[in-house]
From Swiss-Prot:
Signal peptide: 1-20
One GO BP annotation of this record: response to bacterium
This protein's GO CC annotations: extracellular region
Upper taxonomic lineage: Eukaryota, Metazoa, Chordata, Craniata, Vertebrata
Name under which the protein is recorded: Midkine-A
Gene that specifies this protein: mdk-a
């Protein structure tokens, strides 16, 4: 009987301590609400090299915050990582320049980034045309 009472008291104590710890953790996660509404955000600065995880600094009045951000490794540096564009299909190959061109219109500017309304991208013409892949041989009945 004493063992059962001890176990019940121990269980209640453990539950009380864990609920208090969860409450403290939840309150710790909340940051003081800011009355700033006009945040100005800088560009994402990668931690190493020129792409991957990084940080972005924002200011509002006298308050400064840092956010984690990520620069995709396939981004076009001329356009900026915070400018998202909708691109058309690649044009025909220009024989004189040896390049294909396509244009893109601004779809979204993240963090109030200063983006161009339209941009052009170029790439070298491919030397050989791609052929459609054929079905795999040897699979199935003959």
């Amino acid at each position: 009987m004493e063992l059962r009472a001890f176990c019940v008291i121990l269980l209640i104590t453990v539950l009380a301590v864990s609920s208090q710890a969860a409450k403290n953790k939840k309150e710790k996660g909340k940051k003081g609400a800011s009355d700033c509404t006009e945040w100005t955000w800088g560009s994402c600065i990668p931690n190493s090299k020129d792409c991957g995880a990084g940080t972005r600094e924002g200011t509002c009045k006298e308050e400064t915050r840092k956010l984690k951000c990520k620069i995709p490794c396939n981004w076009k540096k001329a356009f900026g990582a915070d400018c998202k564009y909708k691109f058309e299909n690649w044009g025909e190959c220009n024989a004189t320049t040896g390049q294909k061109v396509r244009s893109g219109t601004l779809k979204k500017a993240l963090y109030n980034a200063d983006c161009q309304q339209t941009v052009e991208a170029t790439k070298p013409c491919s030397l050989k045309t791609k052929s459609k892949s054929k079905g795999k041989k040897g699979k199935g009945k003959e």
